[in-house]
A protein has these predicted regions:
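N-terminal membrane-anchoring alpha-helices
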Residues: 1-21
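A general boundary/transition motif marking the beginning of the first structured unit of a protein
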Residues: 3-4, 161, 179
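Soluble catalytic domains of membrane acyltransferases
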Residues: 18-176
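Conserved small/polar residues in nucleotide/adenosyl-binding loops
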Residues: 177-185
Length: 185
C-alpha cells in the first residue's frame, strides 16, 4: 500500500508530461532518499502534482486537506496510498491527526510530504504565503529532519487565466542539517 503513491505519481508524470510539454529538472534529488523525514515545498498550483510525480520518493505519504478525498480519482488514489488528511476547519481534530502520525512515520520509515503554505499561491512573483505550523510541530515532535524542496515560480508557463504553455521547470531539494530541536514548538 505504501508504494501505491510512488507508482501512481510516477505514472501520472510520465503520462502527463508529453501532453503538456513540461520538462522537469530535479537538483539534489539524492537528498530525498533520507528516511524518515519531512519534505516541505512551495505550492503554486495543480501543476505541482506533475513535478511532484517526477520526484516522488518511494515510501512517502502526503499530508492533505480532508476536502481532497472528494476530488474524483485524486481522492481515491490518495486514500488508497495511505495518505493523511486533516480537517483544517477543526483544529482539535487536525492536532490529533498530526500527533498520531509521527510513530507511524518512524515505524514504516516514511517521508511525509507537506506544503506548509496550506493552499496554492497562484502568485506571479516568486513569493510564499505564510506557513502553517503543522510541518514544524511534526518535526519538533518526531525529531525528524525537514528537507526543503523549492520549485521555481512557473507563472510564465501557467497562469490560471491562460492556457498552459509548457516549458522547462527547475525544482531543487535543499541540503538540510539534522538539528536537535527543542521539544516544544
Amino acid at each position: 500500500r505504501l508504494h501505491t503513491n510512488f507508482v501512481v505519481a510516477r505514472s501520472f508524470f510520465y503520462f502527463t508530461r508529453p501532453l503538456i510539454g513540461l520538462d522537469v529538472t530535479i537538483e539534489n534529488e539524492h537528498y530525498l532518499q533520507n528516511r524518515p523525514a519531512i519534505m516541505v515545498g512551495n505550492h503554486q498550483s495543480m501543476v505541482d502534482t506533475v513535478y511532484l510525480g517526477r520526484m516522488f520518493p518511494t515510501s512517502s505519504i502526503i499530508l492533505g486537506k480532508k476536502e481532497l478525498l472528494y476530488v474524483p480519482f485524486l481522492g481515491q488514489f490518495m486514500w488508497l496510498g495511505g495518505n493523511v488528511f486533516v480537517d483544517r476547519k477543526n483544529r482539535a481534530s487536525a492536532i490529533k491527526t498530526m500527533d498520531s502520525i509521527g510513530a507511524y512515520m518512524r515505524k514504516n520509515n516514511l517521508m511525509m510530504i507537506i506544503y506548509p503554505e496550506g493552499t496554492r499561491s497562484h502568485l506571479a512573483t516568486p513569493d510564499l504565503l505564510p506557513f502553517k505550523k503543522g510541518a514544524f510541530h511534526l518535526a519538533v515532535q518526531t525529531q525528524l529532519p525537514i528537507i526543503p524542496v523549492v520549485c521555481e515560480n512557473y507563472y510564465r508557463l501557467y497562469d490560471s487565466k491562460t492556457r498552459f504553455e509548457g516549458g522547462r521547470l527547475r525544482v531543487a531539494a535543499v541540503s538540510y542539517t539534522h538539528l536537535t530541536l527543542p521539544t516544544k514548538a
